[in-house]
A protein has these predicted regions:
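Long, contiguous interaction/targeting segments characteristic
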Residues: 1-44, 48-71
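Intrinsic-disorder-associated, low-complexity terminal segments enriched in Asp/Asn/His/Tyr and depleted
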Residues: 171, 176, 182-183, 202
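Ser/Thr/Pro-rich low-complexity tandem-repeat tracts
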Residues: 183-185, 195, 208-211, 233-248
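Short acidic/polar inter-strand loop motif in beta-rich domains
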Residues: 225-230, 252
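Structured C-terminal cap/extension of enzyme domains
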Residues: 745-795
Length: 802
C-alpha cells in the first residue's frame, strides 16, 4: 500500500481510455519506472549507457518518510505555501490542531505593499476535513510546530459574509523577510471599501466588503492569537494553547495567496457570443517561411509587419504564428520551433536587420559584394539552410552590437537606458539565458553575455512593434502566439530550473494504431510535485512571457494541464505512463495571467482528449482548436453550423497536408515514399478513403452553391480553394483561420509527423514573396470571400456546444 500511495501522491496514473474508448491498464513495472525517473538523482540515461545499476525504489522507513512529506506534512503547517481562490469567492484554507480554539490574525500584504489585517474569531472557521497522524510517524518524520498533536482539522474561512475587524495598518505583526513572494513589477489592485467602524469598536476599522479583493499574488501571514495572548498572561478561549506548540514557539505562518478570475480574458469575444455580426478571422503561418526582398534568408519581423498591412486591408483580425521560442544556438540544423531551448525567449533569427537603429551606420558595409551575394543565394533557396542563415545573421548582429556599444552604451543614451531597463525588468532568468548562449554558441559567432542580452532586447522590441501595428491597422486581436508543450533537456530553461523538472523523462504520447511504438517528443516535463513545492513559479513566468506582445496565445497540447505521457530516458525503466498535474491550479494561474495581459487563450486539444479537461477548459473560457479534416461524424464532414462556437476552426495546420496536397493525394504518395505507409496496398486503401472524402467535400460545397455541379475529376483546384475557404468561414466557430500557404495554393508540407531526417521539416519556404502575393487576384478574391462569410445577419445566432 505504501508504494501505491506514493505513486498516487506523485501523480503517476494507473489507467486511461485510448482513442477507441478501450480501457487500458498501465503495467505496474511501467508506473514504477516513471516513479524511479522522478526520484532518481542520477542521470538515468547516462546510467543506462554505462550499464550502471539504478537506485532501487524506496521501502520501509524511507518510503514512509516520502509518503509522510506528501500526504501529512502540510496538515501541520497551518497555511498552505500556495493557496488560491476565485475573486468572487475569496476564502482561506487553514490547518490547525483539533484542540486549538483561539482567534487568529490574518495579514494580507498586497502586491503594491498595502496591508489589510483581519482579526478573526475562531467561530468564523468552518471545518471541512480532518487527518490523524500516527504519533510514531510524527516523532520520526515530522517537523511540526505543534507538540504532541496528532489530530488536525482543515478549516475554510470565507472572507465574504462575515464581520471581521481590520486593525490599523501600523499594528502589524512581525513579517518574515524570508517569505517567498512572486516578483511582479507592474502595479495591481489592492483591497478597498473599508468603512467606518461601529460605535465601541476601540478605533478599529470594520471591514464590511471584501468583494473588491484584487486579482493577483498576495502574501498572507497568519498569527495564532490563542498562544500569543497566553504568553502575555491573558486568558484565552483555548485553555492549553501554549502546550500544543513545540519549543520553537512558532506562532506565525506565511504563504502566497493568489486571487484568480473565473475565466480567461475574452476581449471582443464577448460581443461575438452575444450575436455581433462580425466574427474574427485571420491567417496562420510559419514566420520563417515568408519571402521578401528585404530579408536575410529567412522570414522575419519586418515581413510580419508587411503581412499585417496586407491582410488588415481585407478585415483580418489576427495572424497566428508558429512558436517564436529560442532554439539551440549550438545546433542550428535542428530547427523545430516545438523543440526550443527556452520558451521564455525569442529566436533572434526573426530580427529584421534593416529595422534595427544600429543598421543605418552599417548600410555601406552591408551593401558590399560579399554580403549581398550571400544574401541573394540564401533568399533564392526554396528550403531554409539554417546553419548558413544563422552564421550570416549572427555575423551581422555582431556589427550591430559594436555600433550599439559605441553609439549608445558608452554615452548612455536614452536607447541604452531602455536596454538597461529591459535587462533589469527581465532579471536573473534573462541573464542566465545570455550566459548559456555565450557558453554554447559556436566559436565563429561567440560573443559576450551583453551581446545576447542585446539580441533579446531588439527581438522583443520588434515583436512589440508588430503587435502595435496590428492594432493600429484595426485588427481586433493582432498576433496569436504559440506556446510549445515542453523544452529540450540541455536548454537553459530546463537546466536553470532543474529543481522543477524531471530530468530523467521526456514527453510524448502512448502507443496507438497510428503510432504503434508511441511518440517521444524529446521534451523535458515539469514535475508536478516539484512545481507545487516551488509555488508554480516557472509556470507563472512561462505563461506571462508568452502572453506579451500578442492578443491571444495558443497552448500546444493543452491536455498537458491535466496529464502528460512520460517516457523514461532509460529504456530499462519501461514504456511510460501518464503523469497528472494540478489542473485546477494551473488553469486558475492561466486565467489570471490572461486577464492581466488582456490575452485570449486557445487550447490545442486535438488527439486523445480526456473528458476530465473538456468541461474545465470550456468553463474557463479557453477556446478549443478544431481542424476541418477531423471535424466529421458518421455522415462525413460536419456542416459549418455544427462547429463548436468556443473554438478556433483551422482549415489545416502544420501537422496535416495543405489543401492542395490533400485534394491531389500527393501527401499520401509522399508518405509511401517515406515508408510511413508500409505497402502499396496501404497506399491504395488510403487513396480510396481520400476519394470518398473528396466526394463528401464536393457535395458540401455544391449544396451551398459555392461550386458548380460537375464530375469530381473536372473540378479546378483554384476554384475548389476559392469555394472551400469561405465554406469553413461561414461556420459557427467564434474564430477562423486559413494558412497563408493554402491561400497561395502551395502543396508542400511544413512538417510530416513521424519523420526526422527523412524529410526536411520546418525548412520549407513559400513559393512567392509578399509583394508578389499582394498582386494576385486569386488571393484578393479569397480574402474578400472569407471576410464576407464572417459577417452574419443581425438575427443570426450561434449554437454553443462543447
Amino acid at each position: 500500500m505504501g508504494l501505491e500511495k506514493l505513486l498516487y501522491l506523485r501523480g503517476v496514473g494507473a489507467d486511461f481510455t485510448d482513442c477507441f474508448g478501450q480501457y487500458i491498464c498501465i503495467p505496474e513495472a511501467d508506473r514504477q519506472g516513471i516513479l524511479t525517473c522522478m526520484l532518481q538523482e542520477k542521470n538515468t540515461q547516462a546510467c543506462e549507457a554505462k550499464d550502471e545499476p539504478l537506485t532501487s525504489l524506496p521501502s520501509g522507513d524511507e518510503l514512509d518518510a516520502q509518503v509522510y512529506q506528501l500526504d501529512a506534512h502540510h496538515w501541520t503547517q497551518v497555511l498552505p505555501a500556495f493557496h488560491w481562490c476565485y475573486v468572487d469567492e475569496p476564502w482561506v484554507c487553514l490547518y490547525l490542531p483539533q484542540s486549538y480554539r483561539g482567534d487568529l490574525l490574518l495579514t494580507f500584504t498586497c502586491e503594491q505593499g498595502e496591508r489589510v489585517i483581519l482579526e478573526v474569531p475562531f467561530s468564523a472557521l468552518k471545518p471541512i476535513g480532518d487527518y490523524r497522524i500516527q504519533a510514531e510517524e510524527l516523532a520520526q518524520f515530522g517537523t511540526s510546530p505543534f507538540a504532541n498533536e496528532c489530530q488536525f482539522l482543515q478549516y475554510r474561512l470565507d472572507l465574504l459574509g462575515h464581520e471581521f475587524y481590520c486593525r490599523d495598518a501600523g499594528d502589524t505583526v512581525k513579517q518574515d523577510s524570508n517569505a517567498e513572494q512572486h516578483n511582479l513589477s507592474e502595479p495591481r489592485r489592492s483591497w478597498e471599501n473599508v468603512s467606518a467602524a461601529p460605535n465601541g469598536s476601540n478605533n478599529k476599522d470594520y471591514l464590511s466588503d471584501l468583494s473588491c479583493l484584487g486579482l493577483g499574488y498576495h502574501t498572507l501571514s497568519v498569527s495564532l492569537l490563542g498562544l500569543a495572548d497566553e504568553q502575555q498572561g491573558v486568558s484565552t478561549a483555548s485553555p492549553s494553547a501554549a502546550s500544543i506548540f513545540a519549543a520553537s514557539k512558532t506562532t506565525e505562518f506565511h504563504g502566497t495567496f493568489m486571487v484568480a478570475p473565473r475565466t480567461a480574458y475574452q476581449g471582443g469575444m464577448s460581443a461575438v457570443a452575444q450575436g455581433k455580426r462580425h466574427k474574427p478571422w485571420g491567417v496562420s503561418l510559419q514566420l520563417y517561411s515568408l519571402r521578401s526582398e528585404s530579408q536575410w534568408g529567412i522570414g522575419d519581423f519586418g515581413d510580419l509587419e508587411q503581412l499585417i498591412g496586407l491582410v488588415a486591408e481585407y478585415g483580418a483580425d489576427f495572424i497566428q504564428l508558429n512558436p517564436l521560442h529560442a532554439l539551440d544556438i549550438a545546433a542550428p540544423e535542428h530547427p523545430s520551433p516545438y523543440s526550443p531551448c527556452d520558451r521564455r525567449r525569442l529566436n533572434p533569427l526573426y530580427i529584421h536587420l534593416p529595422s534595427v537603429p544600429e543598421f543605418e551606420p552599417l548600410k555601406t558595409e552591408f551593401a558590399a559584394k560579399e554580403w549581398q551575394e550571400t544574401i541573394a543565394l540564401l533568399n533564392a533557396e526554396n528550403w531554409l539552410d539554417y546553419p548558413k542563415v544563422s552564421e550570416l545573421k549572427y555575423r551581422a548582429f555582431a556589427h550591430l552590437y559594436t555600433v550599439f556599444c559605441e553609439h549608445h552604451l558608452q554615452p548612455n543614451t536614452p536607447r541604452a537606458q531602455r536596454f538597461e531597463d529591459f535587462v533589469a525588468e527581465q532579471g536573473a532568468p534573462l541573464r542566465e539565458f545570455a550566459q548559456a548562449e555565450s557558453l554554447r554558441s559556436p566559436r565563429a559567432i561567440a560573443q559576450d553575455e551583453g551581446f545576447y542580452l542585446y539580441l533579446q532586447f531588439v527581438a522583443e522590441d520588434q515583436l512589440q512593434l508588430c503587435q502595435l501595428k496590428a492594432k493600429e491597422a484595426g485588427m481586433g486581436i493582432g498576433l496569436i502566439r504559440d506556446l510549445a508543450v515542453g523544452a529540450a533537456l540541455q536548454g537553459v530553461e530546463v537546466q536553470a530550473n532543474s529543481q522543477q523538472f524531471c530530468l530523467n523523462a521526456s514527453i510524448g504520447a502512448p502507443p496507438d494504431p497510428f503510432a504503434p511504438q508511441g511518440q517521444n517528443w524529446g521534451l523535458t516535463p515539469l514535475d508536478p510535485v516539484k512545481l507545487k513545492q516551488h509555488q508554480y513559479r516557472h509556470f507563472i513566468e512561462l505563461t506571462r512571457a508568452n502572453m506579451t506582445h500578442c492578443g491571444a496565445l495558443r497552448i500546444d497540447h493543452v491536455m498537458g494541464l491535466l496529464r502528460l505521457w512520460w517516457w523514461p530516458l532509460d529504456k530499462r525503466l519501461g514504456h511510460g505512463a501518464y503523469v497528472y498535474y494540478p489542473v485546477e491550479t494551473l488553469l486558475a494561474i492561466l486565467c489570471l495571467e490572461s486577464q492581466r495581459a488582456r490575452c485570449v487563450v486557445i487550447g490545442e486539444d486535438l488527439g486523445l482528449v480526456p473528458p476530465d479537461i473538456i468541461h474545465r477548459l470550456y468553463q474557463a473560457g479557453v477556446y478549443s482548436n478544431e481542424l476541418f479534416y477531423f471535424c466529421k461524424d458518421h455522415q462525413g464532414f460536419k456542416p459549418p453550423s455544427q462547429y463548436k462556437f468556443q473554438s478556433l476552426m483551422m482549415l489545416a495546420n502544420h501537422d496535416v497536408p495543405t489543401l492542395v496536397a490533400w485534394w491531389t493525394g500527393s501527401d499520401l504518395h509522399l508518405r509511401r515514399q517515406l515508408d510511413l505507409l508500409n505497402t502499396d496496398e496501404q497506399l491504395g486503401e488510403a487513396l480510396a478513403g481520400r476519394e470518398l472524402e473528396k466526394h463528401q467535400l464536393a457535395q458540401c460545397l455544391i449544396s451551398q452553391g459555392l461550386l458548380a455541379e460537375t464530375d469530381i475529376q473536372q473540378i479546378d483546384i483554384e476554384d475548389l480553394l476559392t469555394a472551400w475557404m469561405p465554406f469553413g468561414a461561414s461556420g459557427n466557430s467564434a474564430l477562423y483561420s486559413v494558412q497563408w500557404c493554402d491561400l497561395l495554393g502551395d502543396r508542400h508540407a511544413v512538417n510530416i509527423p513521424g519523420t526526422w531526417l527523412e524529410y526536411p521539416n520546418w525548412q520549407r519556404r513559400l513559393p512567392i514573396s509578399l509583394s508578389e502575393a499582394a498582386g494576385r487576384p486569386t488571393l484578393a478574391e479569397r480574402l474578400q470571400r472569407i471576410a464576407a462569410a464572417r459577417h452574419l445577419p443581425e438575427t443570426a445566432a450561434h449554437t454553443d456546444t462543447l
